[in-house]
């Protein structure tokens, strides 16, 4: 097997695990600092910020492991329905694939980078694993310089 074939086989195993065995990616949530918590998994970092106005989530992973995210948030004593803002760091499916489900559950406002918004509004066909990113309502845009 060539090096390229080995890499492709390894990537196939990783993708299978991500989509068909998400429980293998479970990670215990933990406090990072003061009011910031890690609620992601071993593959994708997701952060929860507790504010007086409600919860802010930075990224949300993807549909297949949304239940892990919800379990992590609840495990820290928070209610996922209290998420007010979801900030998507970038347009990869594993950082925003569960956005619509979270929006439906909590009615959170979604923030996305202006440059990434193009792919969600104009060129969804250019999103890798597009079928893993259900359409969602974009409420606000942020600039990379902010």
Report residues per predicted region.
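Residue-level detector of flexible, active-site-proximal loop/helix-junction positions
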Residues: 14, 18, 43-45, 64, ...
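Active-site HxH/HxHxD metal-binding segment of metal-dependent hydrolases
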Residues: 36, 64-67, 74-146
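Conserved beta-strand hairpin/beta-sheet module of binuclear metal-dependent hydrolase folds
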Residues: 22-76, 80
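A short, structure-level motif marking secondary-structure boundaries and short turns
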Residues: 12, 53-55, 84, 131
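Accessory terminal helices/loops
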Residues: 1-22
